[in-house]
Amino acid sequence: MKKKISASFLGAKIPAKVLTKLNVTDVDFIHVDVMDGKYVKKKTMPFSELSTITYYTEKRLDVHLMVMKPLKWIDNLATLNVDCITVHLNIKDNIDKIIDRCRLFGIKVGIAINPDQELDILYPYLDKIDKVLVMSVNPGLPGQEFIPSSIEKINNLREELKKRNLKTLISVDGGVNFLNAKDLINADILVSGSTIIKSDDFQDAITKLRKCISK
């Protein structure tokens, strides 16, 4: 399977010109973080802003819900060009209900695991979801450095998926750059913000990141 790249935006209003520039690249997704001010302290990205993003981009959205009650978001998100909705486990809504609701709309489902969480909390859901999002920084704040222990977590998760004969994808989000991406060969999707957006050539950055995890 071709390794994928998701260009990330953490709650800031995304300039139309940036989205337009990404349209002419082969980036796979626009990764959007949504925060409710409860799961994490920061509050961002109302639904109206997400709607605006889809007006300017042809890319599918990869939505990361850092919220306590994801269920109330799903119906609205289903009206947009959303590929996958990722939620966290330590929330108020029932995970199985979230999975069922996403399936109803034909939307893929992901579960995020934070740096301080052990992999085994994911095990009951691995055969029910499409993706695991390994957080390589603590959720909610931009500009953090990549946490090196995330590499071992990704490698261990890959072994667990092989053992179970599952095709669940592994995505990694947080502080991903050209230096650490080469150690993320067991990831299927790299989520990267500033490495792409702050580069002079978006396509060049995307190509380099993809090569880092392609065998």
Where do the model's predicted regions map?
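Glycine-enriched alpha-helix->loop->beta-strand junction motifs that scaffold or abut catalytic
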Residues: 25-29, 56-59, 78-85, 101-110, ...
